[in-house]
Amino acid sequence: MHPVLRQMRPQPRATTASAAVALSGSGEQEEPQCPTLELEEGEGIARLGAHSPERHPRVQLARDSRVAFVPRQNMFRDNSGEEAEEMRDCRFRAGRELRRGFNRERLLREEDFEPDEHSGISSARAHVSAANLVTAYEQTVTEERNFQKSFNNHVRTLIAREEVAIGLMHLWDFVEAYVHNPASKPLTAQLFLIVQHSRDNETFRDAMLNIAEPQGRWLLDLINILQSIVVQERSLSLADKVAAINYSMLSLGKFYARKIYKSPYVPIDKEVKIDSFYMRMALKVLTLSDDLGVYRNDRIHKAVSASRRRELSDKELMHSLQRALTGAGTEDESFFDMGADLRWQPSARALEAAGVASADVTGDDDDEDQYED
């Protein structure tokens, strides 16, 4: 504790001489007072009882809650627009080359921080810079690998659904018709209806609205490629379709990246970003196809639990048996159509919730008894 703060503390109450004589005359001995330590008294330079880091409560708390943390880095996507052109590509390739002969077990010592006579850079500084490049390279590879795995899982889940193939077929059919006849009012109405399903992505929505124009050509190519893989190639396995879609995304990304830079050499970070853009748009097309594929023109049947259907009477059972023996009915008759002529009666709980009078239910039961007779 600081000496000035120690003098400002109130002193403990001292025993007077008369009180000491009275205590000695009575034969009572004064018990020695143990110094009590108030740990909650003061902080900083006014703290008591913390003469070493091992006894300091805040130091111990910080040590117990300390967690090793390495900040996340991605050379391709962090600090967009703040670095020199092609610098990300150089750092990525440098980290990949340094990773091969990098000594991860090296322990820096005092003499390692002395600058070199020729280069003026200490070996410790060079080692730390190399470690930063290697760490950034490894974290970038890990994040890009996770992004690719996530894309593969999403694509595999979507193309496994039959609704996606049906919706993509109708979407491609509409796009081909609209490109050849953009002035058609019915097709324009369909276009605005389709755009309603893609309001969360402005880039995709604008490209869909301008798909008949040159600025929407890339989306038309993407839909054609996905349709040729998912709809046309029905014999391909699920893994082959995922691989074909990935190859198509890489081909499209490389083509447009070279078109942007007007050179066969494109920085790897820009090529990865363009590939990621096409991957996100491919997922958007497949998701839109899933939304459109659920709107079928098939007859929708509501499956009713067997416990909520009235059991067959003897007369109805014999009638159904006669129809089955004679082969009555059409060949397209489905399982649910077999019981279409039966009468379904809701449960008593459902009737009570709907507020139907008990007299109505009794009347229905009488009608059923007459039907059975």
From Swiss-Prot:
Which InterPro entries would you find in this protein's record? ADV_PKG3, L1-like
Keywords associated with the record:
Host nucleus, Late protein, Phosphoprotein, Viral genome packaging, Viral release from host cell
For this protein, what post-translational modification is recorded in UniProt?
Cleaved at different sites by the viral protease during virion maturation.
Judging by the UniProt lineage, the source's domain of life is Viruses
Q: Where is this region: Disordered?
A: 1-32
What is its induction behaviour?
Expressed in the early phase and late phase of the viral replicative cycle.
Specify where the region named Interaction with packaging protein 1 lies, as residue ranges.
1-150
Q: Does the keyword Phosphoprotein apply?
A: yes
- Chief subcellular location: host cell
Places the protein is found: Host nucleus
One Pfam entry name:
Adeno_52K
State the GO CC annotations.
host cell nucleus
Listed under GO biological process in this entry are: viral DNA genome packaging; viral release from host cell
Phosphoserine, modified sites: S52, S334
The disulfide bonds in this chain are none
Assembly behavior = Part of the genome packaging complex composed of packaging proteins 1, 2 and 3; this complex specifically binds to the packaging sequence on the left end of viral genomic DNA and performs packaging of the viral genome. Interacts with hexon-linking protein IIIa; this interaction is required to promote correct genome packaging.
Q: What else is known?
A: All late proteins expressed from the major late promoter are produced by alternative splicing and alternative polyadenylation of the same gene giving rise to non-overlapping ORFs. A leader sequence is present in the N-terminus of all these mRNAs and is recognized by the viral shutoff protein to provide expression although conventional translation via ribosome scanning from the cap has been shut off in the host cell.
* Family in the record: Belongs to the adenoviridae packaging protein 3 family.
Question: Briefly, what is this protein's role?
Answer: Involved in viral genome packaging through its interaction with packaging proteins 1 and 2. After proteolytic cleavage by adenovirus protease, L1 52/55k protein is removed from the capsid during viral maturation.
The protein here is known as Packaging protein 3
